[in-house]
């Protein structure tokens, strides 16, 4: 019965849903400001496929420079959220209203999924950015749009990983 409220608004298991703070705004048909749009930071978990791909492609170092630039601009603090010192962090672009429902994160992890990256809002809500199935050759999903930063000579770490897995 798991579903997204974007497709099935009355699902009893809304795995993907709008955040509670957005619901009231959307019910009034006021869509401005309800979308996560542009670059946002994601803290990556150690010993995950996602972290390994970002390390292999050099994107961690590349994104570290941009994160340091954003830290100097107080008006962009919302893009970084709460960062944890010493944690590996990347920036990816977004364009969506729906998020993994925090109520289901523990259940999904208990059943084998790994949330390998997250963004932490200033209210301490963690928004899941990456999910993977560790023992699968390549089952990785993201909230971001890696195609926005992918180039032929510098592919997205996730696209790089997918092609690499296809070649095995």
Question: Where are the predicted features?
Answer:
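Amide-donor transfer/coupling interface in amidating biosynthetic enzymes
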Residues: 1-168
